[in-house]
């Protein structure tokens, strides 16, 4: 569950470091390596972007499935799209569970 969330962060780190600085693997091991880190967005912005990406992935999988029904896509393309959508959904579920757990812990705190 945590691995899926960390892999999302790794993909964004790789995208940021492409074309500049040392190899992406070096910046994954040492976050300070490479170029100066850009300003991170707010937590709500990051969650919004992840949600948008998950929805886009699921719509893409649905579209690929419909193409396969019409005979325009092969089985491998459908499986790849559906597996990508499933991974996005599992990540969203894991984040939701963590947020609910954190909320319940805060609600149980004594003031």
Swiss-Prot record:
Q: What GO molecular functions are on record for this protein?
A: cytoskeletal motor activity; structural molecule activity
Localization, per the record, is:
Bacterial flagellum basal body
One GO BP annotation of this record: bacterial-type flagellum-dependent cell motility
Going by the UniProt record, its keywords in alphabetical order are: Bacterial flagellum
Q: Which residues cross the membrane?
A: none
A cellular component term (GO) from this record?
Answer: bacterial-type flagellum basal body
Q: Where is this protein primarily located?
A: other
State the family named in the UniProt similarity comment for this chain: Belongs to the FliE family.
**Do you know which HAMAP family this protein is assigned to?**
FliE
Q: What is this protein called?
A: Flagellar hook-basal body complex protein FliE
Q: Which organism is it from?
A: Rhizobium meliloti (strain 1021) (Ensifer meliloti)
């Amino acid at each position: 569950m945590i691995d899926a969330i960390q892999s999302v962060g790794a993909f964004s780190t790789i995208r940021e470091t492409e074309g500049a600085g040392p190899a992406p693997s070096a910046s994954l091991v040492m976050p300070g390596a490479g170029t100066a880190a850009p300003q991170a967005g707010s937590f709500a912005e990051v969650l919004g972007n992840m949600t948008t990406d998950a929805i886009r992935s699921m719509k893409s999988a649905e579209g690929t499935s419909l193409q396969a029904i019409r005979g325009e896509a092969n089985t491998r393309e459908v499986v790849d799209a559906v597996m990508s959508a499933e991974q996005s959904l599992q990540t969203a579920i894991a984040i939701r569970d963590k947020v609910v757990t954190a909320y319940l812990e805060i609600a149980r705190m004594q003031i």
